[in-house]
Amino acid sequence: MTQTPEALTTEQFKQAIIDKGQYYHIYHPFHVMMYEGKATQQQIQAWVANRYYYQINIPLKDAAIMANCPDQRVRQEWIQRMIDQDGEYPDGGGREAWLRLAEAVGLSREQVISEELVLPGVRFAVDAYVNFARRASWREAASSSLTELFAPQIHQSRLESWPQHYPWIDDKGYEYFRSRLSQARRDVEHGLTITLDSFTTHEQQQRMLEILQFKLDILWSILDALTLAYVHNEAPYHSVTQERVWHKGLFK
């Protein structure tokens, strides 16, 4: 009879989660290029415009988690994530802060909101994340958010390197990164508690680690799409036309 592998201890499981940080998109060549001051203004703008699509879908992901969660106490805490991103009327929250970043790098908010610059590969990756959150159990979807463990480092890196390398970016554009330093740490504490309490068998823990890898794949794939289009100059249909003929989103 095959013996069932033993579950990791809480500390071992936590360390296995932390070890996934080696695959975080902070190490993607596109991010490294931005940190090292080697990105052009067009490349910075492309990242901001495409990342906007990720930003506006995060509240939809969080809404899906809450819709699937019967635990009132969890919902009471999780809803703060939606408020952080969407704000409380009339404040625009993280979404508005991101649009100010877009303006700071030389984009118009109208162009960013139109999503005309969002690459199909970016759209597909983000949509896959939202659809996963809708279909998965709330505990699994919540655990996918644990890439936030590594987020403070990435925000701090931008705050330290961008002003030095890109003095043409207006300082007001950095508000989003500053706000996320504390918000991400708070969110991690809640998400990590849920995860460590929810996944207690070997099989459950391995599935959770695979879910976390799925989320890391999404973040990495977003940058792969940007690299192809804005580093190698091979945007979709580049061999046919230089126009942005790809679809701009079917459900808006």
Curated annotation (Swiss-Prot):
**Known InterPro entries for this protein?**
Haem_Oase-like_multi-hlx, PqqC, PqqC-like, Thiaminase-2/PQQC
- GO MF annotation: an example: pyrroloquinoline-quinone synthase activity
Keyword annotations: Oxidoreductase, PQQ biosynthesis
The lineage's top-level taxon is Bacteria
Q: Note the NCBIfam families from the entry.
A: PQQ_syn_pqqC
- State the protein's name: Pyrroloquinoline-quinone synthase
Role = Ring cyclization and eight-electron oxidation of 3a-(2-amino-2-carboxyethyl)-4,5-dioxo-4,5,6,7,8,9-hexahydroquinoline-7,9-dicarboxylic-acid to PQQ.
Main EC class the enzyme belongs to: oxidoreductase
> What is this protein's gene name?
pqqC
Is Oxidoreductase one of the keywords?
yes
Q: Which GO terms describe its biological process?
A: pyrroloquinoline quinone biosynthetic process; sulfur compound metabolic process
| Protein EC | 1.3.3.11
What reactions does this protein catalyze? 6-(2-amino-2-carboxyethyl)-7,8-dioxo-1,2,3,4,7,8-hexahydroquinoline-2,4-dicarboxylate + 3 O2 = pyrroloquinoline quinone + 2 H2O2 + 2 H2O + H(+)
UniProt lists the family membership as follows: Belongs to the PqqC family.
Pfam families to which the protein is assigned, alphabetical = TENA_THI-4
**PANTHER family named in the record:** 4-AMINOBENZOATE SYNTHASE (PTHR40279:SF3), PQQC-LIKE PROTEIN (PTHR40279)
Pathway in which this enzyme or protein is active: Cofactor biosynthesis; pyrroloquinoline quinone biosynthesis
